[in-house]
């Protein structure tokens, strides 16, 4: 009989990036890379496990923005073009490296990976990854949960109408896609403030996940630390993140991804090779970018790098999976002995860590699931919903304000680099609330304008933009996105004020920002 449980929770999210006004757009590659390196490999992993009759229980958060992109015809077409381009580059690399055995072997590996990915996407999945994820949920292996509509950082949205609208739109979109209601909701950036659980309860959410101190600093003090479920005063269950599992996988210094045998993310032929040779495969503006073809392993902390050896990296992934499992065995045995109940170790990660940032992460995950099944009997994999069925009665707590960002609170999304956006967002939210009251029961074209205004506001609220401004990565693009969506928001507002709609402009905006086709402005009714 098992003594406890491990809940692996993967949060799959990307901001909504879709630019039909351009033939090719650099930032759309974020989606293409994640498809190639994370989402399709995850589905392949699930397929292998099911074929081998290995039961597994994982929780997967699919954000509404990601689901929208997975469902978008234009992005699917562009993804196929991207794969064709990468296959062509791999063919050139096979020829270029023919006298360099170490690199030639890797060029062949990448050619095979891109070709296989294209075949799966087109022929096996019929370009419909959502259907594939749903299949594993229907079989009981996956618990798919939702997120706020555009990943808005809820503690900084200020207005209760704006907060509830983000949550309600995310839940509604999930229900439309999966024909069922989500049991859980991933709070964007795990951002929590006192009273947020009320909105979750109103939208039918059964549980959410917080950073460690969000539970540990709760009032009253949680009896079982982060190793149990709890209920908020509004009877929504909350789970806390385990710090040990976090450090061992997240940290590039102390954790597994920093092992010297693993692939070096930052050495890429997009930067290493002759400019004229690589130019057709980099940014349309001519800037060097990552292609995903990387020939070196981490090797050490110096610029010197040695060729990547996939076999050794895979051996390390198996070794690290075994180490992770051993540590969970000892951890859960101890917790079981002192808590008097079966503990749950909650291990949430960004899904894109596996395969994209940590190339061997998918292999590690597969080794771990297989080892848990065959190499031990101390704990089992579970999901938050399954654990709540086992322990339906739980202590009542009031979680602490928190996030999983740097320093654990709100500073990443509110600092000198991005604080300028909030007066504008809050003003737009007030405008939307007032317009929803003023035009309470309109139909036809005015309703169409109001619905598009909500789309623009949602897209401006995405937490990704403030995060990029803080890190300095793609910060100019992030600033432009916030400004552009707010400009479109106020342009649409003018149509209502002047009682004159420019249909050409409206259709252009609807075509560019076509997220959530069934969105209704009544979400902002008080």
Where are these regions (language model features)?
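Acidic (Asp/Glu)-rich catalytic clusters
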Residues: 2, 47-55, 128-145, 164, ...
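Conserved short loop/turn motifs at secondary-structure junctions
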Residues: 182-192, 350-354, 474
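Glycine-rich phosphate-binding "P-loop"
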Residues: 146-169
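CE4/NodB-like, metal-dependent polysaccharide N-deacetylase domain
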Residues: 163-187, 327-339, 343-348
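Active-site and substrate-binding clefts of carbohydrate-active enzymes
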Residues: 2-55, 62-105, 220-526
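His/Asp/Glu-enriched short active-site or ligand-binding loop at hydrolase and phosphoryl-transfer sites
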Residues: 153, 205-218, 381-383
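Hydrophobic, small-residue-rich alpha-helical packing segments that form membrane-like cores
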Residues: 191, 196-205, 221
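Short, solvent-exposed turn/loop segments enriched in Gly/Ser/Thr/Pro and often Arg
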Residues: 61-66, 148, 184-193, 213, ...
């Amino acid at each position: 009989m098992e003594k406890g449980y491990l809940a692996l929770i993967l949060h799959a999210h990307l901001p909504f990036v879709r630019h039909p006004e351009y033939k090719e757009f650099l930032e759309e590659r974020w989606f293409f890379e994640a498809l190639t390196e994370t989402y399709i490999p995850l589905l392949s992993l699930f397929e292998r496990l099911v074929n081998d009759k290995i039961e597994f229980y994982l929780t997967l958060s699919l954000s509404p923005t990601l689901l929208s992109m997975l469902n978008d015809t234009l992005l699917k077409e562009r993804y196929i073009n991207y794969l064709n381009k990468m296959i062509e580059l791999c063919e050139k690399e096979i020829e270029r490296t023919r006298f360099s055995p170490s690199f030639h072997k890797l060029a062949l590996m990448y050619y095979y990976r891109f070709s296989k990915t294209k075949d799966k996407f087109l022929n096996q999945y019929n370009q419909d990854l959502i259907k594939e994820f749903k299949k594993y949920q229907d079989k009981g292996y996956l618990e798919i949960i939702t997120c706020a509509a555009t990943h808005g950082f809820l503690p900084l949205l200020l207005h209760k109408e704006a907060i509830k609208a983000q949550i309600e739109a995310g839940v509604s979109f999930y229900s439309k896609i999966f024909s069922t209601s989500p049991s859980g909701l991933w709070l964007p950036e795990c951002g929590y403030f006192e009273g947020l659980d009320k909105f979750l309860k109103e939208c039918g959410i059964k549980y959410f996940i917080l950073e460690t101190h969000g539970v540990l600093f709760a009032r009253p003090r949680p009896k079982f630390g982060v190793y149990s479920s709890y209920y908020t005063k509004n009877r929504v269950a909350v789970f806390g993140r385990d710090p040990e599992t976090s450090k061992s996988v997240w940290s590039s210094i102390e954790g597994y991804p920093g092992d010297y045998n693993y692939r070096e993310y930052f050495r890429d032929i997009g930067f290493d090779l002759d400019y004229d040779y690589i130019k057709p495969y980099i940014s349309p503006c001519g800037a060097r970018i990552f292609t995903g073809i990387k020939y070196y392993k981490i090797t050490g902390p110096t610029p010197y790098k040695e060729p990547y050896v996939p076999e050794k990296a895979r051996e390390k992934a198996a070794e690290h999976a075994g180490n992770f499992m051993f540590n969970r065995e000892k951890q859960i045995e101890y917790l079981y002995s002192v808590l008097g109940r079966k503990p749950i170790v909650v291990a949430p990660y960004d899904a894109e860590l596996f395969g994209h940032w940590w190339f061997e992460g998918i292999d590690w995950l597969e080794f771990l699931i297989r080892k848990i099944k065959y190499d031990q009997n101390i704990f089992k994999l579970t999901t938050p919903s399954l654990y709540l069925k086992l322990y339906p009665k739980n202590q009542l707590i009031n979680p602490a304000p928190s996030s999983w960002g740097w320093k654990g609170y709100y500073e990443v999304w509110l600092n000198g680099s991005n604080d300028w956006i909030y007066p504008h967002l809050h003003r737009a939210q007030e405008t939307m609330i007032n317009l929803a009251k003023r035009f309470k029961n309109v139909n036809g074209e005015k309703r169409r304008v109001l619905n598009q205004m909500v789309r623009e506001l949602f897209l401006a609220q995405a937490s990704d933009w403030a995060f990029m401004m803080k890190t300095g990565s793609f910060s100019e693009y992030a600033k432009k996105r916030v400004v552009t969506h707010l400009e479109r928001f106020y342009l649409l507002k003018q149509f209502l004020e002047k009682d004159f709609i420019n249909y050409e402009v409206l259709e252009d905006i609807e075509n560019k920002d076509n997220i959530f086709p069934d969105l209704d402005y009544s979400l902002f009714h008080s």
